[in-house]
Amino acid sequence: MDRVVIIGGGWSGCAAALAARKAGAEVTLVEKTDMLLGLGNVGGIMRNNGRFTAAEENIALGADELFGITDKLSRHVNIDFPGHKHASLYDVIKVEPHVKRLLEEKGINIKTIARAVDVVMDNQKTSNGDKLMKAIILSDDTEIAGDVFVECTGSTGPMGNCLTYGNGCCMCILRCPAFGPRVSITQKAGMNDIMGHRKDGAFGAFSGSGKLEKSSLSDEIQRELNEKGVVVIPLKPEEVSKDKLDLKVCQQYALNEYAQNIVLLDTGYAKIMTPFFPLEKLRRVPGLENARYADPYAGGKGNSIRYLSVAERDDKMRVTGIENLLC
C-alpha cells in the first residue's frame, strides 16, 4: 500500500487526504495547529456563482463527502449579495469537528500540533533528473516517511511576512504565535517558490474579510442576519476607501459595492467583507456601535497576508523538479 503524507490540514489538505484514502493509500495528515480546516474555520461561502457548478461536478465525480458536510451545516442557502448569486453559508463554528470525524472514520491518521519544518531527500534521482523526497521532519524531530507527499500548507505566514508585507500579525485563526510559523516544504526540498504581487508591486495580498461577534451588533442587524443571511449597510462618502479593494486575495469580492457598503454575511459570526476596518470608524456605523472583532482579533488594523509562497508545478499538480511532491 502506498504511503501518502499530506502536510497541512486546511480544506485542500483534508480533500487530498480523503481522495488518497479512497484511492487505497495509507494516509497521514499533519496539521501544525490543534484544528483542521485552517482558514476554512473563518470562510463559510459556498456555491456562489460558478462555485455551484464546481461543487456539482465534484459531487458527480464521486467527491461528495465534504460538500455534504458544508451543505448540511449551511445556515443559509440560495442567498444573493453584491456580485454573487445563489450562495450557501456554512456555519464556521460547527464545521471542523464534522470534517475531522469523517476523516477519522475513513481511516486517515491525523496528527495535530505537528508542524513540518524540514524534509529528508533521497540520494537517488529519477531518470529525468528529478529529486525524490523520503520523509518530512516535524518540529519535535519526528520523521514521517512516505512514498508520495502533498504540500497543502497554504501561502500565509510566518508572522514576519505579515509584518513586512502587511500591517503586522493581526492574530488570525492560523495562530502562528502559539503553533509556530508555516514552513515551505518545496523550499526545504531545494526548489523555489513564487511570490504574488499586488497592483502596486508589493508582495502578497490581504485576506479579504474578518469576523465580528454577532452578539455585539444591534438587535435589528442580528435579526436580519439570522433571517436573511446578509446585511448591506451604506457608508458615508467620507468613510469609503476603494484602495482596499486592490489589496484583497479574492478579487471576486473587490467590487465597488464592498467599498461603498459594509457587507455582513451570517456564517455563525458576522462575516465582514473587507480586509480590515478601523474599529473606531466601524463603531460610528448605525447598528455597529458595540462591534467587536472575533477574527482576526486586530481586524481593525489589518489581516493575514497570503500568496507569499506558491510552488511551481505542472498541470497534474506535481511540483517542478520533485517526482513525488504534489501541491
Please name every model-derived segment:
Residues 214-240, 256-303:
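Flavin-binding catalytic cores
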Residues 109-111, 291, 326:
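General small-molecule cofactor/ligand-binding pocket signal
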Residues 19, 25-26, 31-115, 158, ...:
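Conserved N-terminal/central alpha/beta ligand/cofactor-binding core
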Residues 3-28:
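N-terminal Rossmann-like FAD-binding beta1-loop-alpha1 element of flavoenzymes
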Residues 301-327:
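FAD-binding beta-loop-beta segment adjacent to the flavin cofactor pocket
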Residues 7, 151-152, 327:
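Redox-cofactor binding/interface segments in oxidoreductases and associated redox assembly factors
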Residues 110-258:
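Predominantly flavin-linked oxidoreductase catalytic cores and closely associated redox partners
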Residues 75-92, 135, 203-208, 261-268:
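Helix-loop-beta segment of a Rossmann-like dinucleotide-binding subdomain
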